[in-house]
Each structure stands twice: as structure tokens, then as C-alpha cells.
Amino acid sequence: MSTNQILHCETAKRLLDEFGHAIQAVLLLHEQQFQSIVEGDSDAGRFDLLIHEALELKQNAKYAYLNHLDSHNCSY
């Protein structure tokens, strides 16, 4: 395996890790919103914008990873 391929795989790993962290952030916000609703918080909707932004970050991370795999023919 060439040095270039190793770097691509390291990049793929980093991008996959970023995608995983973005997914975890969305799940955490959903969990916090659910807990807020269960506790009777009348302002549970305050999570909606945060969730929307987290979902955008997740999508960006997902496509950064997929585009990298496609353009460099590597995998992780």
C-alpha cells in the first residue's frame, strides 16, 4: 500500500469519526428534548432549531465521508 493510500484511509477514518460524532450529537439532542417533554417542560420546542442544525452537520459529515470514499476509492 502506498503512502498516498494510507493517507486516504486515515482521512476516511477521520471523516467517519466526524460522522459518528455528528450522529451522537443528534441523538443527544433528541434524548434531551424527550426528557424535557417527559418532565413537562412547556418550552421543549427550543430543541427544534438545535436539532435542525445538528442534522445539517450530520448530513455534511455523511457526504464528506461518502464523497471521499468515492473520489479516492478507499475505505475504512
Name each model-derived stretch.
Residues 2-24:
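Short, charge/polar-rich alpha-helical segments
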Residues 25-34:
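A short, structured beta-strand/loop element
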Residues 2, 34, 41, 45-49:
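General secondary-structure edge motif
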Residues 4, 38-43, 65-76:
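Long amphipathic alpha-helical coiled-coil segments
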